[in-house]
A protein has these predicted regions:
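Acidic interaction surfaces
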Residues: 1-125
Length: 125
């Protein structure tokens, strides 16, 4: 298995990482989450909420797409939203860890999708 890429220390919506393995290319991109708000959860300090209101941090989602040798298999293959971005200094590590788990899981999904496509192609010949 190839080394898993990581987001930079302070990722922003629009940033992405790409992982290539065995002809597959999986991309995890950060997208802005305009639905989730800190008031929906317990545990945020008043200061954290004020920083969120002042755009000091935001919620994001990670969206994964999968290709095989340039052919798009799944877009999106997976989506996960409601993730904190910029609240802590280690946002890049936090999002990279989540993206890595998603990429590994979706790699298996992409292989299954490719197998289905090959079966369909072989039965129609």
């Amino acid at each position: 298995m190839t080394k898993m890429p990581k987001f930079n220390k302070h990722p922003l919506p629009g940033d992405s990482i790409t992982w290539r393995n065995g002809g597959f290319t999986l991309t995890a991109r950060v997208e802005f989450d305009d639905v989730t708000e800190p008031g929906e959860f317990d545990g945020y300090s008043e200061e954290d909420i004020k920083r969120w209101e002042a755009d000091g941090w935001c919620y994001v989602g990670i969206v994964v797409t999968a290709e095989y040798k340039g052919w798009l298999l799944c877009d999106p293959a997976a989506r996960l939203f409601g993730l904190e971005c910029g609240l802590a200094e280690d946002s890049g590590d936090y999002l990279s860890e989540i993206a890595a788990a998603m990429l590994i899981e979706e790699f298996q999904v992409a292989k299954a999708e490719l197998a289905k496509l090959r079966t369909i192609t072989n039965t129609e010949e």
